[in-house]
Regions:
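Catalytic Walker B motif of ABC-type/P-loop ATPase nucleotide-binding domains
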Residues: 163-166
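H-loop/switch region of ABC-family ATPase nucleotide-binding domains
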Residues: 199-200
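Conserved ABC ATPase "signature" region
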Residues: 116-134
Length: 211
């Protein structure tokens, strides 16, 4: 089943003449693992951001973006928040609270989930990611690798269908990068989550896929 489809998608930023994306047709099958590879400035991040309306950049867009056959603009923000997860390149970009436990709970709180359900989901995800030892720590004390794992866990606690990763290990050391990608592969294998990842280097892509 196609979870995401792009039909003749084009985009140019406001004030720019050149299109960053031009007539892109793409079908993403549910449960697949996809890598978008290209040089810096080739439009990888722009393309990923098109797949979640709250992250779409300002500019001129044409074509269609479908989520399970529905135009993305018609999909509620509640559904997009829960079912389309996004992890940014910079580990510090999306952390919004000062404690690890609260960061895990924040997304669920924002969609109005009852507190008892939040506690269960947060406990499950903390155990799955092995972050119990730093569960009560300040987010400011975490390493880059820990922050990026926390970002991933904070997305996964929402039980998303799609995981969008924008060069997620480019700012991590090799060991942290390997740990992060091993976790992504585990999530994909065990939960069947659809993964779409942007990377700039074919060599890096080969290493990441072989983790």
């Amino acid at each position: 089943m196609k979870i995401i489809e792009l039909k003749k998608l084009s985009f140019r930023y406001s004030g720019e003449d050149k299109e960053v994306l031009s007539d892109i047709d793409l079908a993403i099958e549910e449960g697949g693992f996809y890598v978008i590879c290209g040089a810096s400035g080739s439009g990888k991040s722009t393309l990923l951001r098109q797949l979640k309306t709250s992250l779409q950049p300002v500019g001129q867009r044409s074509g269609r973006i479908l989520y399970y056959g529905r135009d993305l603009e018609e999909v509620s923000q509640y559904t997009q928040s829960a079912k389309i997860g996004f992890v940014f390149q910079n580990p510090d970009t999306q952390i919004v609270t000062d404690r690890v436990w609260h960061e895990l709970a924040f997304g669920l709180e924002s969609i109005g989930m009852p507190q008892d359900m939040i506690r269960v989901r947060v406990a499950e995800m903390a155990s799955y990611f092995g972050i119990q030892n730093w569960f009560y720590q300040s987010t400011d004390t975490l390493s880059g690798g820990q922050k990026q794992l926390l970002n991933l866990a904070s997305v996964m606690v929402m039980h998303p269908k799609v995981l969008l990763l924008d060069e997620p290990v480019s700012q991590l050391d090799p060991i942290a990068a390997a740990d992060f990608m091993a976790t992504v592969h585990k999530l994909h294998a065990e939960f069947g989550i659809t993964v779409i990842m942007a990377e700039h280097s074919l060599e890096e892509v080969a290493l990441l896929i072989c983790v």
